[in-house]
Structures are given as C-alpha cells and as structure tokens.
UniProtKB/Swiss-Prot annotation:
The beta subunit is responsible for the synthesis of L-tryptophan from indole and L-serine. CDD domains: Trp-synth_B (cd06446). Gene3D superfamilies: 3.40.50.1100. InterPro entries: Trp_synth_b_CS, Trp_synth_beta, Trp_synth_beta/beta-like, TrpB-like_PALP, TrpB-like_PALP_sf. This is Tryptophan synthase beta chain.
Amino acid sequence: MKYTYPNEKGYFGVFGGKYLPETLMPALEELEQQYLKIKNDGDFKRQLLYYLTEYAGRPTPLYFASRLTDVVGGAKIYLKREDLLHTGAHKINNTLGQVLLTKKIGKKRIIAETGAGQHGVSTATAASLFGLECTIYMGEEDAERQALNVFRMKLLGAEVKIVKAGSRTLKDAVNEALRDWVTNVKTTHYIIGSALGPHPFPMIVRDFQSVIGEEVKQQILEIEGKLPDVIVACVGGGSNAIGIFYPFIEDTQVRLVGVEAGGYGIETGMHAASINGGTIGVLHGMKSYFIQDEWGQIESTHSISAGLDYPGVGPEHAFLKEIKRAEYITATDEEALEGFLLLSRTEGIIPALESSHAIIKAVEIAKSLDKSKSVVINLSGRGDKDVQSVKNLLDTDKELYERLLSRLKEKYGV
C-alpha cells in the first residue's frame, strides 16, 4: 500500500483538519509553510541529528528481553528503549525538533501543555538548551499527581501555570495553551506534546517521532534479519505510537497494535479509550474520536497514568483504525500495574505507567505466538515519575497488591 497522508488540507481521510478560529489560520498556514521548507533543509537536519545523538542519547537500543520472553513463553519480546533518552521519555524527540524549528522561524517564546509532566519537562529542557522563554500549562489535578515534575520544570527555568478550570487535567491545559497562542502568536510557538491538534501539528509531531520506528526497522533487520511480526505501543494522544508505527505502515505484514487506557473498564465509563469507547467529534482543532456525550460535550476521563488521561486521540490513529491498518485494544489500570510489576521483576526495568499498558498486552500477544516470531514493545518512558503514586496506591489497597503478586506468581512464576 502507498501511504501519503495527510493530504494538502491536513486530513487523514475524514480525520484531522483545522477547526480553529479564523484568527489562528494565518499562524497555522505560516507554520506549515515554514515547516515544509525547513524539514528538508540540510542544515536543519544536521543540527537536529547532532542534538538527538549528542544531547538526547539516540539511537536508543532495541533490547531483547530474554527473561521476560522466557517467563511468558512464546514470541521473542524486544523493547525499544525510549526510556533511556535524556529526560526519560520519547517526548524529547519532538521538543528538540520543534525548538529548533522555533529558532529557525525567529520566535523567542515557547508554550506547551503537559499531562504527566514529561512533555513539560522536555519542553523546558529544550528551551533552556536554546535560551528561549518558556511557559507550561498543566491541569491542577495532574500537577498534584506529578508534583516533582512541576518542580523540575521550574528548576529548568520555565514558568508553570496551573489550570484550575474544568476537569483540571490535560484537556484544560490544552485549552489555556491555545488561548495563550491566539494572544501571542507573533512571538510565540506552541509545542503540542502529542500527535494531535490542528494541522500541521499531527504531521510535525509524527515526523519528529518517527525516528523511533526508523531505528527499530534498521535494528530488527540487523538482529533478526526480518521485520517484526507485531509492534505494540500505548496510545493516549498517540505520539509514541505513531512514531513507531509510521515507518511500518506500508509493511502490511507487520501487525500494529495500539493500547488505550481502559481505566476501570470501558463498561464503567471511567476510562480514557477514545477509539474503543468514544465517537467522532471535534476538539482542540481536529476531527477525531473523543469521549463525549450524545451532544458532543466532552466527558471526564480516567486513567491511572496521567499521560494517557486525555479525552481524544490523534487523527492519524483514528484513520489507521478506519482503514484497518492498525488495531486498538485496551488495558485496564490493574492490567497496567501488572505490566509495571512484571517488567520490573523480570528485566530490572521500571517502566512508565503509560508504557505498562503496552507491556501487558504485548505479553498476551507474544504468548499466543510461536518462538520464531517477534514482538516489539515501544517502552516510551521510564517509571521514576510513577513510583511514588504506585507506592501510595498499593500501600492503601493491600488487597490489590496481594492480587497482583499472586497473579505474577501464577502466570509467570515470578
């Protein structure tokens, strides 16, 4: 299959587009023109490669998780170690690219929204590296869950604005950041943290994140001599997933599996699985799947992981689901905790709760395949930021902890 999306209007099929006030259209058009000109500029590419390599720590390893593979029994499991990047997650791939873009455009200030705080930290990091003024918007509830990341951003010189409106989470932080951008568009570039928002943002973020999949393709061919059978990644807005999926879209023999946050279960209504539990609508400048009521009002979401706790999904994922090129499943909070403990105990790697959703489902898939097959998990971030909240949860819910431990013993003997 030949894949050439988005089209010139910024659509992936019916998804995507630019649903924003007229006042922002010139800024979006200018950004698109500048991006398309700059992205193939030799000097820009050299600079970006330099910082990704020397500063962020690319390429990241594609690590064969031999002990995890043994206890699961089935396909070989590989981990794409985005958790080893500077700042601890895949987010830095995008922020370095976009901050370099900001410099090229000649703007002096950057703003961003953040949920788990990872994108905020990596934006503040890149701003500090290039000497740009930086403001980060964060929902009050997320700021409480991720107090350390709030301090990290301040430490890096960013101003952190806590958003108390609405559900006080990522959706509200995006609203405030968009308001700021409308007001200060002449001096300010908005670095969206995921592959969502109005065109050209989903395309820009995807392009900067696709270094993940490009490396995987090269690495797996060197190790296995063939492409992987399955690639699994967690999906909130979807930037780590689109980053690893995109270079494989035309390789139709490779199964692409996105794992959404099932929260307490889709049937409870307390989840953040937009594709599995949402409907098509418009929010934050794009048409995609959202968790909304029958009148299009956005409903509250729930996930154990702040980074997946967003009521929508990037338009390219909506499209990949529509054309059946990728499949989207869910993992509950409890399943994610199982993945979190399992990887910690088998490989000595504490994963982010976001990535833990992908781990547990990849394990189920690997178990069903024979030993000649391979499954790649995008380990999108490390779990340091989650250790305190997992500790608090398991300290208060002893029954849950016991249940998880006995499940690990029964299923994997660990």
